[in-house]
């Protein structure tokens, strides 16, 4: 109606607009109208996020995977074997939309160079998305086409499945490296609402459909390709890689050399305490950025390698922000206080929120979001879909609404409960950076150096004394030798 139109018009008022709607009384907006105004203002949310994402980087940039491809690109994999950075790159490339480019067969394939060229052509022609960041993805694909290290890698066995009924989002691709091994890459969460729902299902399900398919896919690869295997993935893909490594058959597990988990969530306590986890845990290599908020979810038993990222907060999950020096990641010794705070909060929340209530709350939220026609998360912020979501939220039954509200109440309580520990860690971190604390550390270091020097001096003095004593005893023995002979 005209009333709604003027309520939702965020453009600058013009004389024509004022005259056109002058006859409409301007009453204060209701709460519903106010919510509509706020949500409509966010209707172009995905573009706002993209603009914000571009600014969410610190100035202390170092080389990332793009620079690595150019720097290391002249050395084929048969000369310099696959490293951790290569594994991150191949894991990230699994997000590319290889549909109609790479087939699901294992006896045929397409080179990474040809696949990259087709992806760029389709993106240019149809303006379709690539992985997550079109501008950076285009640069990466162009560099891969010229890289002797990556361009001849063969892509085989591509599968991509999104099943709203089963609440499953699963995709995987296998790379034939050309140096006698194959890399099985599992895709992480994409932009689909179903994909995000499956992620949340992990908090109360022992096994989700994507995990079952990951096991089946890895075993299928092992039967189709007679090569040693490396499995890996980024985000949920890392979780799928670890799960596949645990629950494949013994013959397949014996052929898996390494499992890469790049900032992927962990598992419930029953899974990480299982016998299957113990069979593969020494082969799992988990990498997280210093402010990780995704990779620290759920429970882990394997050690972390902390990677320096120039992203801010949750945007450190983006593989393009991970910093590289030469052929390896820039590694840090400790995660930030924000990451520890998120970790403590989520774990406390999951302990307080029983599995049945988790299921009810998550199913309720998903039912509301599914009321729209949007398949992707970004679609939810379109005007027509937003109104559908609001209507569904208003029609939510009392039991489901109570479960959702209780979940958010417990989340708030968990956040408050984690504040003291966060403040303590923050204060300790800040104190360590203070000038007087640094001088104190320098004094401690100097004292340690002096103590070591004194210890060395004492050791040398004792050694000399022992040498003199031994020499004196030998001289005395020589003097007494004639007497002893007599």
List PLM regions with ranges:
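Alpha/beta hydrolase fold serine-hydrolase catalytic domain that processes acyl esters and thioesters
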Residues: 60-85, 90-172, 177-182, 186-201, ...
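Gly/Ala-rich beta-loop-alpha elbow adjacent to hydrolase catalytic centers
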Residues: 233-237, 241
